[in-house]
Amino acid sequence: MNRIEERLAALKEEGKKAFITYTTAGLPDYDTTKKIMFAQEKAGIDIMEIGVPFSDPIADGPVIQDASFKAIQNGASLEGTFTMMGKVRKAGLNSPVVFMLYYNTVYHYGVENFVNKCIENGVDGLIIPDLPFEEQGEIKDVLAKNEKSPILIQLVSPVSKGRIPMLLENARGFVYCVSQMGVTGKGAN
């Protein structure tokens, strides 16, 4: 069991739900992101979702796109985000951390190198919104090589009713339920 599974099991035993936050890494800078992470842990959040800045975040709406763009302008990168993660773990951050990023980032870094860096820096889970279940073979094979690998969080969308049982059967930790079609953070809903 990793930190995500441990936290969720404890919450289930207490009859509580998980409170999961989202923060864009490196916005406005990594020092601020680290402070935000420790403040969230102190406030009692259950799981932190850290968005790895990407130049073309197609599943995200204007707010997260803008945050990602500004973070990149300020020097944020995957390597910098890994370094930040290593520092917060060494400084005592115990909360589960999930990276939300796009598969292009993983692919260009090299899947095996990426997973090894996640393990080395204490990343507990991955949300990869542009990687459908049917195309997860390579990363799943690499993740399966090490019990300390992060959990690959499955996304379940409103149009996938026939796929829901398959996705749930293959899920670990939690599932990311897409509540509406389209990009996140767009409109008044």
Short names for language-model regions:
Residues 7-27, 61-67, 88-100:
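N-terminal small/glycine-rich loop or linker at the start of catalytic domains
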Residues 169-189:
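Active-site rim beta-loop-alpha module in soluble metabolic enzymes
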Residues 44, 118-124, 144-152, 170-177:
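Glycine-enriched alpha-helix->loop->beta-strand junction motifs that scaffold or abut catalytic
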Residues 21, 40, 51, 118, ...:
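Conserved, mostly hydrophobic/aromatic
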Residues 19-33, 98-110, 151-159, 187-188:
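Active-site mouth loops of central-metabolism enzymes
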Residues 20, 46-49, 127, 175-176:
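Conserved beta-strand positions in the central sheet of alpha/beta enzyme cores
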Residues 1-11, 54-65, 76-86, 106-113, ...:
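Active-site-adjacent beta->alpha loops and helix N-cap segments on the catalytic face
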Residues 30-41, 159-170:
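Catalytic cores of alpha/beta
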